[in-house]
Each structure stands twice: as C-alpha cells, then as structure tokens.
Amino acid sequence: MSNIIKQLEEEQLKQNVPSFRPGDTLEVKVWVVEGAKRRLQAFEGVVIAIRNRGLHSAFTLRKVSNGTGVERVFQTHSPVIDSITVKRKGAVRKAKLYYLRERSGKSARIKERLGA
C-alpha cells in the first residue's frame, strides 16, 4: 500500500527545482487568479526556513515591503509556482533564520557566500 502512495507522490514531484539554502535570495513566480484573468506575480525574498518532506516540502521567504516585514510560505512542488530563481547566495550558519524578524536595517543584512 505504501509503495503505491510513494509512487504517486514521486510522479507529482517537480524536476526543475533549483537547489537553495537558508540565507539565499529567491525570486518565486506564482500564478494568481483574479476573476477570470490569470497572471504571474513575483515574490522576492530571503529564505528563512526550509522544510524537506518529499511532496510536502515547503520553504519560507521573507522580504521587507514599505518598512513592513512580509513572510510567505511556498509549497515547493505546488502547481501554482511557475518558476524559482536563485538571485543571490547568502552565507549563514543556522538552518532557521527566525532571528531576522527582530532585526532591521544593517543588522538584518546577510553576507554573500563566495565560491559557491
């Protein structure tokens, strides 16, 4: 029984997901439905958390928009996601960057990972 479920989940996994780590800056293009129209909306932010659970994998992006912190959780293999692009690689030493929520300005910056 579990082999059938595992096989169905493997068929639904996306193959074009780039590798990224916490601290990286990503641009995620998402399909948004407004009435009868369908359009792409971009969300660019820093990865503050990754949850690896096969088909149920997710990652959290954080950006500051007009002085307000905005966080959004994306399901990695969701059909709503059109593309994921790595804009910048960040050098951090923790897996979860929740401490960025309390920081602002220069202390919220992340160094760039060199040689990656």
Curated annotation (Swiss-Prot):
GO CC terms in record: cytosolic large ribosomal subunit
Coiled-coil region list: none
Annotated GO biological process: translation
Record-linked Pfam families: Ribosomal_L19
Entry-linked InterPro entries: Ribosomal_bL19 (IPR001857), Ribosomal_bL19_CS (IPR018257), Ribosomal_bL19_sf (IPR038657), Translation_prot_SH3-like_sf (IPR008991)
An example molecular function term from Gene Ontology annotations: structural constituent of ribosome
Keywords for the protein's UniProt record, in alphabetical order: Ribonucleoprotein, Ribosomal protein
Protein role: This protein is located at the 30S-50S ribosomal subunit interface and may play a role in the structure and function of the aminoacyl-tRNA binding site.
Family under the similarity heading: Belongs to the bacterial ribosomal protein bL19 family.
Name of the protein described by the UniProt record: Large ribosomal subunit protein bL19
Species: Actinobacillus succinogenes (strain ATCC 55618 / DSM 22257 / CCUG 43843 / 130Z)
